[in-house]
């Protein structure tokens, strides 16, 4: 027949095409020609480079989106807290608000004790029971108002958290150790002093409380806003509660 004889041999009028690798009728691969091969490799390399750039751009867009999403969520939480604070359903200073529809308040000593006393669990959730100033945290502030509290009259005040211990028998009041560094100026000369102090952390008010080892019985408190672990309002007061100095501190670690 036209396609073959009885022995299976091809009786085609045309030879079978060769050169499946781009060599045409010669049967040679295109890569056998160094000039063609180099050109194609260079073209592939350029395409891969373009793809890598596109992937990098997409990664940057994704990172920016995630960062923006986190910032928006924190901003929303801050606004929510501000609105809550303006409404007339506050708990007194010795209680924590459960922030529920019933406006429930629970005692300060029940916050972060390992048992849920708020029906919504707000007193034991991660946000409430996280310590804003962990070990190694360092905060510094400038004192620009008249200091009627201290003997040293510092112009700069820094505290560094050196240890936090959460007692098993009373976890709602972690013990804190810190170092206080003060810079003072007198007669044009700067002096620095340091104090090792003990204190506690107050979950209800997000507050570090440090007690002076001196005989002046001063108490230093630094209160963190909700959703902000980088700034705190510093207050120096006498053991009787009278405030004699206020200033703002910022995280520097």
Curated annotation (Swiss-Prot):
Keywords assigned by UniProt, alphabetized: Disulfide bond, Oxygen transport, Transport
Pfam families registered for this protein in UniProt: Eryth_link_C
SUPFAM superfamilies, per the entry: Extracellular hemoglobin linker subunit, receptor domain, LDL receptor-like module
Keyword set includes Disulfide bond: yes
A single MF term (Gene Ontology): oxygen carrier activity
Domain of life: Eukaryota
Disulfide bridge map: 91-105, 98-118, 112-129
Transmembrane as UniProt keyword: no
InterPro entries recorded: Eryth_link_C, Eryth_link_C_sf, LDL_receptor-like_sf, LDLR_class-A_CS, LDrepeatLR_classA_rpt
Domain called LDL-receptor class A: residue spans: 89-131
Gene3D superfamilies: 2.40.128.620
Subunit structure: Disulfide-linked dimer of identical chains. A model is proposed for the subunit structure of the Tylorrhynchus hemoglobin, consisting of 216 polypeptide chains, 192 heme-containing chains, and 24 linker chains.
Function noted in UniProt: Acts as a linker for the assembly of heme-containing chains in the construction of giant hemoglobin.
The protein's name in its UniProt record: Giant extracellular hemoglobin linker 1 chain
Source taxonomy: Eukaryota, Metazoa, Spiralia, Lophotrochozoa, Annelida
């Amino acid at each position: 027949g036209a396609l073959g004889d009885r022995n299976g041999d091809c009786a085609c009028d045309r030879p079978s095409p060769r050169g499946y690798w781009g060599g045409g009728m010669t049967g040679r691969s295109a890569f056998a020609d160094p000039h063609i091969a180099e050109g194609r490799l260079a073209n592939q390399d350029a395409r891969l480079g373009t793809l890598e750039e596109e992937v990098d751009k997409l990664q940057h867009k994704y990172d920016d989106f995630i960062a923006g999403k986190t910032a928006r969520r924190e901003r929303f939480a801050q606004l929510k807290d501000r609105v809550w604070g303006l409404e007339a359903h506050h708990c007194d200073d010795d209680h924590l608000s459960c922030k529920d529809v019933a406006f429930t308040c629970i005692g300060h000593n029940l916050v972060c004790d390992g048992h849920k006393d708020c029906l919504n669990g707000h007193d034991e959730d991660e946000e409430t029971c996280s310590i804003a100033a962990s070990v190694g945290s360092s905060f510094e502030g400038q004192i620009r108002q008249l200091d009627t509290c201290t003997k040293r009259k510092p112009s700069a005040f820094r505290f560094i958290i050196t240890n936090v211990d959460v007692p098993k028998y009373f976890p709602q009041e972690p013990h804190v150790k810190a170092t206080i560094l003060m810079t003072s100026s007198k007669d044009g000369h700067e002096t620095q002093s340091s104090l090792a102090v003990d204190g506690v952390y107050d979950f209800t008010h997000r507050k570090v409380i440090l007690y002076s080892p001196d005989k002046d019985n001063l108490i230093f408190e630094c209160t963190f806003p909700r959703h902000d672990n980088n700034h705190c309002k510093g207050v120096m007061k006498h053991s009787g509660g009278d405030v004699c100095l206020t200033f703002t501190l910022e995280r520097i670690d």
